[in-house]
Amino acid sequence: VRILGGVKSPVLEEVKKGDKLTVLEDVSDWKKVCTKSGIVGYIQKSKLKDAKKETISREFEEPDYTGIKKDYKINLVWHQVTSEAANEGIEDALAATKGLNTISPTWFSVTDNSGNISSIASTDYVDYAHQCGLEVWALVDNFDQNVDDMELLSHTSSRENLENQLVNAALQNGIDGINVDFEQIPTDVGDHYIQFIRELSVLCRVNNLVLSVDNYVPKGYNTHYHREEQGVMADYVIIMGYDEHFAGSYEAGSVASYNYVKEGIEETLRDVPADKVINAVPFYTRLWNETPKTDEERAEDQGTEAESYSMKVTSEALGMEEAAQRVSEAGATVTWDDTANVSYTHLRANE
């Protein structure tokens, strides 16, 4: 069964003689079919035999998906770990915090289209976190630019390899859960992505691992992440309630204004049960630099989204302590914005 009609189209699933397929539509010499496992794709007409019509029963009962639900509020922090040596910073990191019960180190990354991963997981890290009363939900990302999300997620074999590697690494290191942080998923990959979440949820459930999935603030352009289905399959759905304005923004603004955060929570609650929703807040802000565009820059922006903005904007991310220090050093006055519910300040270049 292939992604599209044609012998050169990638294979989605191998089927064998005797397998039952549901025909959805005819496309020239190919038929659009659905396999028993729910994969939709195309197969040559000549490969199909004994076609017959069946009346499908509508008496369907939604299965009861069991999962893991903690009897306490999740207070989670992501811990950016970029090397095995950086795992040793867990003691200092936790010493500066209080109230946490979950930590999510950035340990796993998908490295190729076959579903292999890199890992900097540490059992010593896990043991120390457990001693401090914290669960460890290891994060996996898809940030490697050499990985094609369609190639990775549209094939059963690569999904299974990725799922098995994640669960095996979790079990080997005593990890309590997996946090999926797949970003910038193309629209046409959405169905394959949610299939990955479905399959991973089964493995996690069998092995008593918590599954959490990171999501953008809901917008029309990211509905293909299938939040409602995530709300069924995952134990927790995490809103990345920040990046309202980000490094590539055309105008300066808040990282997470009140209404933006409120919208993210309310829209997510339309699809996901409240006891599964976690909202992530930023512990950083941005220092913005605005300069009037030159004639050359305005010409370059013609016909693009940037055309309607008169200022050229750059920024750098600052942790909250560094941001406060910069404000103090500049002798700037901090103002409270009643609409955004954030503090801000601004300086002219000659001040």
Regions found by a protein language model. Name each.
Residues 14-46:
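SH3/SH3-like beta-barrel superfamily modules
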Residues 35-69:
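Boundary regions of SH3-family modules and the immediately adjacent low-complexity/disordered segments
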Residues 55-160, 165:
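Glycan-recognition patch characteristic of GH18 chitinases/ENGases
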Residues 75-77, 103-105, 136-138, 178, ...:
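Hydrophobic faces of well-ordered beta-strands that scaffold small-molecule active sites
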Residues 113, 164, 190-323:
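Substrate-binding surface in catalytic domains of secreted glycosidases
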Residues 163-192, 241-243:
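Active-site groove signature of glycoside hydrolases
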Residues 345-351:
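Conserved small/polar residues in nucleotide/adenosyl-binding loops
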